Amino acid sequence: MSTAVANRLVEIDEEARLAAVRRYDILDTPPDGSFDHVAKVAASLFDVPIAIISLVDHDRIWFKARYGLDVEQIGRDPGLCASAILQTDPYVLTDASCDPRSLANPLVAGEFGLRFYVAAPLRTGDGHNLGTLCVIDHKPRVVSEEQIAQLEALAAVVMDQMELRLAARRAVTELEQMVALKDAALERSSMLTREIDHRVMNSLQQVSALLSLQARGLGNSDAA
């Protein structure tokens, strides 16, 4: 496969992934206690100062929930989450300053001083990674397989919450559409009733007029 074809396939997949992000309609929504709680639990599980639930947009990484961090978003480059969503398995950096994948990253080499980073992808049922649940520390750490499995379980909880919210929004939309259809049907029924009443009234008036004419005709005949 040529490089151009491979790059185009990546672009198509990214377009589909971004469409999935939009489908959940969660970017730039207010803080949510259930997501905040998951981030706090993740930080406690790893005994680290920072945990983030992130969504990777086309040019930024937006934080739906964050523990131990004040910023709401960062640029997609150099964010590590943008790299983490490229794989289905958790992305693990026990010492980012020594890992060739990250040692030149500004978040590692710069003032922030990131050293430890573990991210579990937020993966949809149709196979798109929307973002990550990640934990961060400023010093190297050892991580166990059990901790990684627990982080994946928490990421699944995040996706369950997102799916529930999506289903609720769809249910509300369907209900609103049904109400609109019902109102439209009632309006049509009301208009039809008014039209029938109008036609019946006109017919009655015509019959009454004919009867009056007939009565006058009979009266004139009697007089003759």
Protein language model features and the residues they cover:
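Regulatory sensory and allosteric helical modules in signal-transduction proteins
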Residues: A19-A20, I50, V56-R66, V71-R115
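Signal-transmission linkers at sensory-effector interfaces
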Residues: M1-D32
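Amphipathic alpha-helical "output/dimerization" segments
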Residues: V143-D160
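Helix-loop-beta substructure at the N-terminus of cytosolic sensory domains
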Residues: M1, D28-I61, D77, L213-A224
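Short beta-strand-to-loop transition segments that serve as allosteric relay/switch motifs
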Residues: T132-R141
